[in-house]
């Protein structure tokens, strides 16, 4: 019996795949547990339409990520931070991914989820720093930060 997998089934198939499986297995397990449905012409047509719309949506997301990358990596787009600095040259506060995301929104109107900013640890130094950002699985960018001493 041909079935369309609705979810990943270990050892049998991934979501969206059309495969031939034994009749009893399909009826008694896959279809009962809503893991698959029978591959009728109508169901296959629906699947193809759904896959096309998902591909279109993925292409739109990729184009948007590339546009944001271009905007982030412009030379004049440098995030400005002013922090108090102690005698050892380290800032009193730290600059976290959340702060960077908020400043991007405030200074340039670019909304990025803080989880996409790849900061190993909060920044506590002054100067020019580049921080990597994962905008899409295929698109990475660098945010330029300029951290100044508030006493200057």
Curated annotation (Swiss-Prot):
Pfam family, one: Ribosomal_L9_C
GO cellular component terms given for this protein: ribonucleoprotein complex; ribosome
Keywords carried by this UniProt record: Ribonucleoprotein, Ribosomal protein, RNA-binding, rRNA-binding
A Gene Ontology biological process term: translation
Keyword Cell cycle belongs to the record: no
Source organism, top-level taxon: Bacteria
Molecular function GO terms recorded: rRNA binding; structural constituent of ribosome
Assigned protein family: Belongs to the bacterial ribosomal protein bL9 family.
UniProt-listed PANTHER family: 50S RIBOSOMAL PROTEIN L9
Known function: Binds to the 23S rRNA.
HAMAP family associated with the record: Ribosomal_bL9
Name of this chain's protein: Large ribosomal subunit protein bL9
The organism's taxonomic lineage, starting at the top: Bacteria, Bacillati, Bacillota, Bacilli, Lactobacillales
Gene name for this UniProt entry: rplI
């Amino acid at each position: 019996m041909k079935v369309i997998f609705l979810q990943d089934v270990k050892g049998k198939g991934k979501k969206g795949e059309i495969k031939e499986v034994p009749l009893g297995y399909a009826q008694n397990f896959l279809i009962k547990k809503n893991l698959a449905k029978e591959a009728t012409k109508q169901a296959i047509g629906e699947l193809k339409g759904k896959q096309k719309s998902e591909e279109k949506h993925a292409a739109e997301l990729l184009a948007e990520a590339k546009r944001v990358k271009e905007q982030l990596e412009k030379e004049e787009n440098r995030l400005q931070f002013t922090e108090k600095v102690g005698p050892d040259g380290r800032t009193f506060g730290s600059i976290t991914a959340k702060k960077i995301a908020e400043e991007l929104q405030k200074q340039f109107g670019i909304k990025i989820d803080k989880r996409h900013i790849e900061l190993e640890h909060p920044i506590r130094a002054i100067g020019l720093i580049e921080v990597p950002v994962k905008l899409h699985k295929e698109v990475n960018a660098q945010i330029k930060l300029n951290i100044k001493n508030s006493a200057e």
